[in-house]
From Swiss-Prot:
PANTHER family the UniProt entry points to: ANKYRIN REPEAT DOMAIN 36-RELATED, POTE ANKYRIN DOMAIN FAMILY MEMBER D
Entry protein name: POTE ankyrin domain family member H
InterPro entries from the UniProt entry: Ankyrin_repeat_domain, Ankyrin_rpt, Ankyrin_rpt-contain_sf
Compositionally skewed regions (Basic and acidic residues) per UniProt: 414-429, 443-458
Annotated segments matching region Disordered: 406-524
Species of the source: Homo sapiens
Presence of the UniProt keyword Repeat in the record: yes
ANK repeat ranges per the UniProt record: 180-208, 209-238, 242-271, 275-304, 308-337, 341-370, 374-404
Stated family: Belongs to the POTE family.
Entry-linked Gene3D superfamilies: Ankyrin repeat-containing domain (1.25.40.20)
Pfam families linked: Ank_2 (PF12796)
Top-level taxonomic group: Eukaryota
Alphabetical keyword list: ANK repeat, Repeat
Amino acid sequence: MVAEAGSMPAASSVKKPFGLRSKMGKWCRHCFAWCRGSGKSNVGTSGDHDDSAMKTLRSKMGKWCCHCFPWCRGSGKSNVGTSGDHDDSAMKTLRSKMGKWCCHCFPCCRGSGKSNVGTSGDHDDSAMKTLRSKMGKWCCHCFPCCRGSGKNKVGPWGDYDDSAFMEPRYHVRREDLDKLHRAAWWGKVPRKDLIVMLKDTDMNKKDKQKRTALHLASANGNSEVVKLLLDRRCQLNILDNKKRTALTKAVQCQEDECALMLLEHGTDPNIPDEYGNTALHYAIYNEDKLMAKALLLYGADIESKNKHGLTPLLLGVHEQKQQVVKFLIKKKANLNALDRYGRTALILAVCCGSASIVSLLLEQNIDVSSQDLSGQTAREYAVSSRHNVICQLLSDYKEKQILKVSSENSNPEQDLKLTSEEESQRLKGSENSQPEEMSQEPEINKGGDRKVEEEMKKHGSTHMGFPENLTNGATADNGDDGLIPPRKSRTPESQQFPDTENEQYHSDEQNDTQKQLSEEQNTGILQDEILIHEEKQIEVAENEF
């Protein structure tokens, strides 16, 4: 069935999707030939889409958009998680550039740089040049900006879907559970009846979803049932169909009381589920700091990674959970951990546009020059995403680091230079002071000699004679023997006869010190002798007159 060019087939003539899949081949259903019968695309020269022929197929799609509808490419799989929910708010940036054109007609859809219609389709490619250059080989489904990440050529941001964290509680149907599982889930059975059930039934029995009574009771917060099962020593680390333990479900469902009881009885907190998440990942996602602290206390690995390579810290940054990120930093989480694309916590924070988390990470002296697998740094992502506040934060941090490094390099050299200059000045000063002290001593001695000579000339002789009676009378009062004591030599005995032994045993420095002390003592002795001699000469002269 091929319609004539320019005509549209009736909606009733459209085949069901199951028959359509085999005919689609490489064409997606929007471009499938029968949509317009042209063999090219479902748009005409006006560029308008006529979706009237798609009503039957659309009714089958339900909540799935055309991107993720399993029959879109005949793959039978969707491009997002099992929930199929699209965050349309994240598409605003791309939609604003696309105008009225859908992503299937968007010139960069196939990475070819051309539209999927002829030149008559009136596609305005000029408006798409900037975006097209960033998209590279990625089609609009996988282009990172579709998820609001602002990244390119690293991997689809859609890989970081939250499907693992969606719908944490079990979907339970009564007909799928036996008596023990019903009692564990609803918890309305009296304790006595529950004890009887445990005697008659295997407490570790699994239902169709591989859930035990402990799984159901923990996920629904029935702490009394959990306590009874633990007292009966049930198995703690059994996995359900998602490879989750009862502890993981309790943490995921934020049933802290049940989780603490399981930890106290020795449940392993590091068992990953099919997504690679541990109980700590779910505690961080829920921003449950108390539960995260308890898990770390019982040995949870703070550096465990899920299938995306996200540690609890990277997960907290990706989900913009600022409080738990701050908590993990205090617990010494590795700030340089990398996800599977080589992205650090700082790069993830920049890509998410979280200035507060970027500022928090910069306070920890994190490496801002780290590159991911595509060779991009945090600053390059900030510039390409036009996060002006984050760009300013990174620039300020870089300037501070440059000033810090320059100050650390300059201070030691200046201090060493100043110290050497001060030391040289001190040595020069000590050398100059010693000759001055030595030169002052002869001047003092010469001054004393001049006074004696002047006094002797005053009395007319340099050689004065004294009568015996005057001499005896003058000295009687002092208790002397009547003789004027002979004048002592100016040079002390120690200088007249130097001790050669001392010179041999003392170092040069010690000899210099002793020499200075002896010279000072000699100077004082000579001055005293001169004064005494002068006084006695004056007294003798007065008695003669």
